[in-house]
Amino acid sequence: MKKFGKYSLIICGLLLFTAGTKAQQINNFTVQQAVDYAKKNSVHVKNALLDVLIQKQVNRDITSIALPQINGSAGVTYNIDIPVQTIPNFISPATYKVLIDEGVKNGNGQTITYPAGGFGNLLFPFGTPWVASAGVTLSQIVFDGQVFIALKARNGTISLQERIAELTEENIKANVYKVYYQLVVGKTQIELLDANLNRLEKLKHDVQIIYDNGFVEKIDIDKLSVQIANLQTEKLKANNMIKNGYSGLKLLMGMPIKDSLVLADKLDENQVKEGMLEASQFKYSDRKDFQISTVTNVLNGLNLRRYKLSQIPTFALVGGYSKQAQRTEFNFFNKGDWFTSSYIGLQMRVPIFNGFALQAKKQQARLQLQKTQNQTEALKISIDGEVENSKNNFIAAIATMDFQKKNMALAEKVYDQTKKKYEIGTGSATEINTAQLDLKTAQTNYISALYDAIIAKVDFLKATGKL
């Protein structure tokens, strides 16, 4: 029994370990895989795609207006008090006339005459206590200008929601690119910090030997220790920023925070330089926001036309068929008469006067169309500015990146030469500290220029609609 309990604990532990391992998924993603993952899992993209599906159902609702409308009805009524109709007494006068003409006498032996108070009224109950009915009605729009325009606008509304969804995907893609490569640049920064630490550790080791031989002071070693501590602190901060960056990227992609994310892409400067498109290759229609503006203009034009067509008469076919039974008792399932009624007709509705409401709506639609047209023209100007600025920034960023790369290589060369001079006793501690500081500054500038070039490329591709 004790053995069984021991093995049970082991088995449970293994199961829990297996479950925990499955719960944490490891994702080794290139930037394109990260973008694809975000398109499938980002809440913003999901909701944008749901808006497309919602619009499709709205269009189905609009389409149903143009289809036959068939409604059925059935019911049973019990008349507690049957309605009574009062009519003048037309029976008694005729009876009295016959009696008077024949000279008939009453029981007292007197000749019958017309009563002095008249004959009064007759009371007739119309209906029966129990009434049952069942029927169906049909209506079909033959022509309605507003419905016609609504049907015509269906493709436009779907296109609008699809363009909005694509714009959402594009924004997510741009942000994923920026954060992804920011983390890649961060990894490069860590590599440079490690290289600097190795240099300083080696330099400190060499200076320690020189110090042991009595050629340098203890302060030279202390200065190197301070620099090493500063670099270690900087590396710690950089690693913390990278960890937070991974969390931000997962959040942007819609990935569970507990999952592991590994960046598979390396930083390739030649890849950054690719895509420097000429301005002549740019088209407004490549931009998702311009496509949205274009579709909006079309829909606003249809909206204006809808109000214009609402002044035209509408036509509809109507029809109905019903059965009714009347009983003194609830016995509708027994044999008895059911009376049929049916009709068919054509209805016309003519708008005559609505208090100038239609004129106001038409003017609103016309002004709204003018407004969106103005916004489209303003968007063109804005796009031109974005393309020009992003192109200039991209070119400048590439040039800066190349310059800083050369400058970093030169600073590294200067440091190596200064270190050799210091080791053979022809250089000073100040010179090597300055060279180390210059190298670190050059590396920092290169990292910054590299990231700026990536951001500039993403902004340029987005501005030209090529992202």
Residue ranges and their predicted role:
Residues K2-K3, Q57-N59, R163-A165, E169-Y284, ...:
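Periplasmic alpha-helical coiled-coil/stalk elements that build and connect Gram-negative outer-membrane
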Residues Q25-I26, S73-V136, K266-E274, V318-V350:
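Small/polar, glycine/serine/threonine/aspartate-rich low-complexity segments that form flexible
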